[in-house]
């Protein structure tokens, strides 16, 4: 004990000396470099967009009217991997650039969207405009029927609707839709088996405190509209829903005006929805907290023209896309590509509840656009002050929009060592700083804010993390006990699943790879030395996932099974297959609902924790932004990707789900907190580095000689 105490005191004294190193907050600067080649995934320029828009209008005779034949969206169509690899690896030509356009044809009785490919760019009046089919596998590739409301919108109908339901809204809330005293949340516009089209609306109280809190203010009353006709003057109210009962318009009017009717308790806006500072302040919280600083020039290189980054042994390109947000391409580690593409595919939120709108609610956030929803970051809060801030861009119907400071890049200390060891016998202690390089972006989609991180580590690992905040979409509390907790006067937290699907196209020593599966299992065995006595222990069961038939995978309950993308044709010098293992580092879920009534075939990619398929140029994405319009025959039905093909030494793609089962509670008010609503996946070298842990080459480590006297 005496020796231990003396040793400990000596160690503390030595470390205390090292901590006296002066720290200077010097302004950071970017190290500018030139990328090895053009960024073939770069977003459309304004000039490219203008050319595409002009040729579409010219060749398809388009207008700008809301319900007519018009452009809905134009954005960049990423090149095929096969073409890019010819360019990157075989000195081929740079792939030609093409645009994708979604065009609404609103003139037919049943309007529809048609996808087009335009190019090569730059476009002129003679540039080819042809239906885009190859990325889609629906029955009618590249064509999606839409409801009358989706084509025409609801704004023109609002004055008429307000007048029709005024007797109800006056009686219940002493206001009208036209007056703005109440509003509503739109449900899902649906095609029905009898050829009608309907939609539910859930009434909301208005936010009055200057905060975006309307989703916390449900009023417990819903109505269903028939929207079959292309003329909104023919739309009408089909049903009302209140207090777990369905009413016809006539019966609901009679009920509301009956002498014994009890109006629903309203959710009323107030300080409880505000994120302004409230009293009393935390103890000593008025003092300045610790703050991360940069002590010198940035330790990464950047080509801002091509969106190319180098950090330590890593390099990669990034690109922002209207639908999917920020993606990474051609991730190289130690001069070898390890990931061709790392990208968000869909951000799905599936709700449940007793009322029609939450019961039917499935939000496909690429429909809104994760890139369109990228926001300007708040320096010092969303990212460190010393981070590098970059703009992003997205294209829509009318042009290219620049979002300033939408991406941040920075290094940070993880506040725990990457590795360490103290040896009393040999008289030393060693430790290495765990420095992480982060590429961060945030998308605010309606009421929710999603923070995404791509993290790079000294040990060759990459992590993808997502955190959620913002205002929950609440439900009315009456009758909703099986779907949420009562969290305010008349408010229930509406249970929902968040599922964020990522594509990870790994290339380990080339494109031809396999999936190694290793399971830790209990074992009872007799060893030659155990003299016939059984020994209870454990062992490794090694194998491979050889077919797409077996590649719909859920994480083992105790994480006893690990999966690694390996190259069986390039064993290391010890005879093991080099690879990158992938695993969850935070809660990572799949969709709870089986055979979702509201999601149909549009969300098969969310039904397991991960999938592994052969890479194909005609299967570039797990989902499409327009899948929600026709869930029975979506543009991309992911289930069709799983057609039993071999996974033995093929070009493989992982489709990995992150997210959380969210049951809101009182602490979700006013906003959900990111410390609990988060998920993460890690890709890490596994028998990939023959020389061992690469961090031994880092200058950010110390070896301290200990004195025992």
Swiss-Prot record:
Gene Ontology molecular function terms on file: copper ion binding; primary methylamine oxidase activity; quinone binding
Modifications the protein undergoes after translation, according to the UniProt entry: Topaquinone (TPQ) is generated by copper-dependent autoxidation of a specific tyrosyl residue.
Gene3D superfamilies, per the entry: 3.10.450.40, Copper amine oxidase, catalytic domain
Keywords from the named record: Calcium, Copper, Disulfide bond, Metal-binding, Oxidoreductase, Signal, TPQ
One Gene Ontology cellular component: plasma membrane
Entry's family note: Belongs to the copper/topaquinone oxidase family.
UniProt-recorded name of the protein: Copper amine oxidase vicK1
Native species: Bipolaris victoriae (strain FI3) (Victoria blight of oats agent)
């Amino acid at each position: 004990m005496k020796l231990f105490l003396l040793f400990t005191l000596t160690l503390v004294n030595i470390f205390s000396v090292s901590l006296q190193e002066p720290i200077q907050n010097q302004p950071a600067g970017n190290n500018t470099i030139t990328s090895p080649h053009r960024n073939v995934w770069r977003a459309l320029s304004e000039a490219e967009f203008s050319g595409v828009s002009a040729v579409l209008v010219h060749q398809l005779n388009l207008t700008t009217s809301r319900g007519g034949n018009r452009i809905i969206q134009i954005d960049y169509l990423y090149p095929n991997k096969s073409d890019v690899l010819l360019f990157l690896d075989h000195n081929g030509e740079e792939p030609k650039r093409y645009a994708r356009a979604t065009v609404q044809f609103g003139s037919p009785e049943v309007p529809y969207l048609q996808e087009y490919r335009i190019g090569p760019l730059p476009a002129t009046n003679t540039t080819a405009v042809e239906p885009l089919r190859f990325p889609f596998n629906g029955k009618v590739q590249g064509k999606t029927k839409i409801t009358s409301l989706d084509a025409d919108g609801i704004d023109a109908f609002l004055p008429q609707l307000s007048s029709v339901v005024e007797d109800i809204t006056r009686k219940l809330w002493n206001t009208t839709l036209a007056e703005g005293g109440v509003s509503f949340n739109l449900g899902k516009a649906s095609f029905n088996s009898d050829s009608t089209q309907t939609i539910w609306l859930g009434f909301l109280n208005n936010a009055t405190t200057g905060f975006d809190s309307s989703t916390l203010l449900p009023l417990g009353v819903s109505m269903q509209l028939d929207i079959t006709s292309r003329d909104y003057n023919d739309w009408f109210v089909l049903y009302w829903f209140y207090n777990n009962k369905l009413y016809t318009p006539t019966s609901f009017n009679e009920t509301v005006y009956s002498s014994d009717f009890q109006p629903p308790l309203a959710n009323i806006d107030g300080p409880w929805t505000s994120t302004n500072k409230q009293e009393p302040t935390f103890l000593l919280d008025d003092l300045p907290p610790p703050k991360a600083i940069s002590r010198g020039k940035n330790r990464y290189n950047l080509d801002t023209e091509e969106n190319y980054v180098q950090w330590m042994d890593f390099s990669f390109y990034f690109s922002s896309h209207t639908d999917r947000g920020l993606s990474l391409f051609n991730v190289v580690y130690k001069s070898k590509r390890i990931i061709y593409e790392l990208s968000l595919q869909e951000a799905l939120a599936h709700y449940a509840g007793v009322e029609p709108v939450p019961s039917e609610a499935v939000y496909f956030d690429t429909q809104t656009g994760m890139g369109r929803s990228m926001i300007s970051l708040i320096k010092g809060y969303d990212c460190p002050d010393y981070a590098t801030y970059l703009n992003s861009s997205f294209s829509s119907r009318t042009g290219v929009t620049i979002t300033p400071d939408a991406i941040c890049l920075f290094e940070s200390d993880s506040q725990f060592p990457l590795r360490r060891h103290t040896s009393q016998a040999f008289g030393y202690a060693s430790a290495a700083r765990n420095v992480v390089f982060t590429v961060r972006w945030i998308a605010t989609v309606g009421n929710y804010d999603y923070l995404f991180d791509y993290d790079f580590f000294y040990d060759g690992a990459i992590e993808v993390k997502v955190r959620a905040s913002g205002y929950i979409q609440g439900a009315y509390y009456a009758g909703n006990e099986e779907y949420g907790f009562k969290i305010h006067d008349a408010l229930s937290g509406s249970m929902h699943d968040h599922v964020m699907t990522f594509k990870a196209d790994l290339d380990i020593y080339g494109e031809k790879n396999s999936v190694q599966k290793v399971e830790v299992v209990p074992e009872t065995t007799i060893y030659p030395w155990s003299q016939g006595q059984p020994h209870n222990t454990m062992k490794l069961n090694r194998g491979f996932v050889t077919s797409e038939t077996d590649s719909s995978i859920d994480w083992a309950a105790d994480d006893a099974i690990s999966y690694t993308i390996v190259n069986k044709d390039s064993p290391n010098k010890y005879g093991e297959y080099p690879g990158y293992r992938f695993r969850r580092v935070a809660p990572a879920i799949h969709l709870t609902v089986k055979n979702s009534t509201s999601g149909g075939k549009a969300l098969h990619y969310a039904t397991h924790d991960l999938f592994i398929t052969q890479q194909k140029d005609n299967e570039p994405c797990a989902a499409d932004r327009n899948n929600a319009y026709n869930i029975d025959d979506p543009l991309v039905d992911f289930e069709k990707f799983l057609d039993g093909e071999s996974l033995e030494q093929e070009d493989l793609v992982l489709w990995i789900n992150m997210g959380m089962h969210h049951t809101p509670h009182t602490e979700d008010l006013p906003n959900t907190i990111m410390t609990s609503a988060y998920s993460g996946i890690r890709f890490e070298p596994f028998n990939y580095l023959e020389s061992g842990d690469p961090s031994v080459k880092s200058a950010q480590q110390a070896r301290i000689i200990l004195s025992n006297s």
